[in-house]
């Protein structure tokens, strides 16, 4: 059974807090609660098993310790047709049979502290950059990025509420701290404008950020699709896990092979 949620119990919060996807769901609930049409959460139940889903715009996130309500979840996806599905591996055999979806592998990397180069300029890090400029940088690297109004509304809302933080370096490279829950930090939206690629800005910026977060006692990770894995390996970040996500193939984008923004 799938029912829309109006609240979250302490026990459910504790379960979601055990995984990165669960923490991501919690961050959206912290940002938006249960009253927005574009951010809806659902409880999956089957016998004594329970799972949770959150549909934010065109992304569906599923968190469950065991497979639960698989056929109902498949029907839910057929009705809503999210662009991306992030789910436990146990859901994939059922959901991968849906037409017009492709599997994309992504790797979790730990932001391992590394020395920055002598050329790095910490004073060039902006902690409250102009978000319009940030979007322009992101769009060059992620053609499947949300439309500007949707991205700006969500990003500015999450930043105002202290859930996320957007950073830039030399007005050329950007990275976002998507959430920080009990010193577990998810980093994403890493991009460098085309004119500055090959400059080493992203390498230094990420090393600086990894060092800063470690000094604050935080454990930080990011996800990378296969096309970007070699970069994170080259800069010394450690691969910790791999998983598969599903993305729609029937959406006309500039370059769907790059996948949507992480």
Regions found by a protein language model. Name each.
Residues 18-82, 171-189, 193-194:
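Conserved donor-binding loop and adjoining core beta-sheet/short helix segment
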Residues 132-186, 191:
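A mid-sequence, solvent-exposed acidic-amphipathic segment
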Residues 112-116, 227, 234-262:
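Terminal substrate-recognition subdomain of acyl/acetyltransferases
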Residues 68-76, 189-192, 198-215, 234:
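Conserved acetyl-CoA-binding loop-helix of GNAT-fold acetyltransferases
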Residues 79-89, 213-225:
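Conserved GNAT acetyl-CoA-binding A-motif
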Residues 1-27, 106-150, 256-262:
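Short amphipathic alpha-helix that is part of the acyltransferase structural core
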Residues 56-122, 243-248:
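Acyl-donor-binding surface of acyltransferase catalytic domains
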């Amino acid at each position: 059974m799938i029912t829309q949620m109006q609240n979250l119990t302490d026990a459910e919060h504790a379960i979601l807090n055990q995984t990165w996807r669960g923490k991501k769901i919690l961050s959206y609930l912290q940002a938006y609660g249960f009253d927005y049409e574009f951010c809806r959460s659902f409880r999956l139940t089957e016998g004594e098993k329970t799972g949770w889903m959150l549909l934010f715009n065109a992304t569906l996130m599923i968190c469950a310790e065991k497979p639960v309500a698989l056929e109902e979840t498949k029907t839910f996806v057929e009705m809503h047709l999210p662009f991306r599905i992030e789910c436990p591996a146990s859901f994939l055999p059922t959901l991968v049979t849906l037409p017009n979806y492709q599997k994309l592998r992504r790797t979790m990397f730990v932001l391992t502290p590394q020395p920055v180069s002598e050329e790095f300029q910490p004073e060039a890090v902006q902690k409250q950059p102009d978000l319009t400029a940030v979007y322009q940088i992101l769009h060059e690297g992620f053609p499947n990025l949300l439309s500007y109004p949707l991205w700006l509304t969500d990003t500015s809302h999450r930043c105002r509420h202290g859930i996320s933080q957007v950073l830039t370096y030399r007005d050329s490279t950007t990275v976002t701290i998507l959430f920080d829950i009990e010193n577990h930090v998810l980093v994403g939206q890493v991009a460098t404008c085309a004119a500055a690629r090959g400059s080493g800005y992203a390498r230094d910026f990420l090393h600086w950020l990894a060092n800063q977060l470690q000094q604050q006692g935080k454990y930080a990770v990011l996800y990378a699709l296969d096309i970007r894995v070699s970069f994170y390996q080259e800069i010394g970040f450690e691969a910790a896990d791999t998983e598969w996500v599903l993305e729609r193939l029937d959406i006309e984008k500039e370059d769907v092979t790059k996948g949507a923004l992480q």
